[in-house]
Each structure stands twice: as structure tokens, then as C-alpha cells.
């Protein structure tokens, strides 16, 4: 049964500007080391950062919580399987809330066009 859905859209040029400004503190606050390594290794790294940020926002919206209840940006990590399909890996407070809400699965869809990155997250309940 579907528990919640969340969608978010991000302007990729914001992340291009953050990269140009070398705003490392912002990236360290928003993204795990694995996400930073993944994005930095891509030709269009701003696009990949924007997609991951949109996915984190979409997850928070799907939970109906926002960034509260002790959640941090590092509690939600966007990963890809061997075929490139995105998914979420949850840690800390996000993992605990996921279990407390009897959620069983996340579904993630990422897309981009022009200057925009969009993410949708669907949460399934047991």
C-alpha cells in the first residue's frame, strides 16, 4: 500500500554556481561522502548533485516530515544499482522513522531537462 509520494524540482544552475564558488561546506552538509565522490566523478556534476538534492527533498515530502524530528541530510543517501537505477539508503533517524512508520520500500525516479532536475519518491507501507 502506498504511504506517501513526494516530488521536488531543482534548478541545476544553482548547483553550478555552488561548484564555481567552491562551496565545499554546503556540499559536505547536504551530501554524504559517497554522493560527493559519485557526483564529482561525473562530467555534469552539478546535474547529479541537483538530482540527489531533489530526491532527498522528495523523500522528506513523501514522509510528511520535512527536515525535522532530528533528521539530517546525511540520513538519506541516493545510490544507484549496477544498472544505474536510483534508490535511497537510509541511516540514523531516517532509518528509525522508516521502521516506526512501518514502511517497507522506496521507489525513486530521477530526470532532468535543460536547467531542471526533478525527483519523485514513493513510499510503500507493509
UniProtKB/Swiss-Prot annotation:
<dbReference type="Pfam" id="PF01648">
    <property type="entry name" value="ACPS"/>
</dbReference>
<keyword id="KW-0460">Magnesium</keyword>
<feature type="binding site">
    <location>
        <position position="8"/>
    </location>
    <ligand>
        <name>Mg(2+)</name>
    </ligand>
</feature>
<keyword id="KW-0808">Transferase</keyword>
<dbReference type="InterPro" id="IPR037143">
    <property type="entry name" value="4-PPantetheinyl_Trfase_dom_sf"/>
</dbReference>
<dbReference type="InterPro" id="IPR002582">
    <property type="entry name" value="ACPS"/>
</dbReference>
<comment type="similarity">
    <text>Belongs to the P-Pant transferase superfamily. AcpS family.</text>
</comment>
<dbReference type="InterPro" id="IPR008278">
    <property type="entry name" value="4-PPantetheinyl_Trfase_dom"/>
</dbReference>
<dbReference type="GO" id="GO:0005737">
    <property type="term" value="C:cytoplasm"/>
</dbReference>
<keyword id="KW-0963">Cytoplasm</keyword>
<dbReference type="GO" id="GO:0008897">
    <property type="term" value="F:holo-[acyl-carrier-protein] synthase activity"/>
</dbReference>
<keyword id="KW-0443">Lipid metabolism</keyword>
<keyword id="KW-0276">Fatty acid metabolism</keyword>
<dbReference type="GO" id="GO:0006633">
    <property type="term" value="P:fatty acid biosynthetic process"/>
</dbReference>
<protein>
    <recommendedName>
        <fullName>Holo-[acyl-carrier-protein] synthase</fullName>
        <ecNumber>2.7.8.7</ecNumber>
    </recommendedName>
</protein>
<keyword id="KW-0479">Metal-binding</keyword>
<keyword id="KW-0275">Fatty acid biosynthesis</keyword>
<keyword id="KW-0444">Lipid biosynthesis</keyword>
<dbReference type="GO" id="GO:0000287">
    <property type="term" value="F:magnesium ion binding"/>
</dbReference>
<dbReference type="InterPro" id="IPR004568">
    <property type="entry name" value="Ppantetheine-prot_Trfase_dom"/>
</dbReference>
<feature type="binding site">
    <location>
        <position position="57"/>
    </location>
    <ligand>
        <name>Mg(2+)</name>
    </ligand>
</feature>
<comment type="function">
    <text>Transfers the 4'-phosphopantetheine moiety from coenzyme A to a Ser of acyl-carrier-protein.</text>
</comment>
Amino acid at each position: 500500500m502506498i504511504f506517501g509520494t513526494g516530488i521536488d524540482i531543482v534548478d541545476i544552475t544553482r548547483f553550478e554556481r555552488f561548484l564555481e564558488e567552491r562551496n565545499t561546506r554546503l556540499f559536505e552538509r547536504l551530501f554524504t561522502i559517497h554522493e560527493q565522490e559519485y557526483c564529482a566523478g561525473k562530467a555534469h556534476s552539478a546535474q547529479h548533485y541537483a538530482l540527489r538534492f531533489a530526491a532527498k527533498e522528495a523523500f522528506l515530502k513523501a514522509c510528511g516530515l520535512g527536515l525535522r524530528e532530528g533528521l539530517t541530510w546525511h540520513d538519506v543517501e541516493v545510490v544507484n544499482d549496477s544498472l544505474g537505477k536510483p534508490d535511497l539508503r537510509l541511516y540514523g533517524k531516517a532509518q528509525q522513522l522508516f521502521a516506526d512508520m512501518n514502511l517497507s520500500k522506496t521507489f525513486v525516479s530521477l530526470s532532468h531537462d535543460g536547467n531542471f532536475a526533478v525527483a519523485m519518491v514513493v513510499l510503500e507501507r507493509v
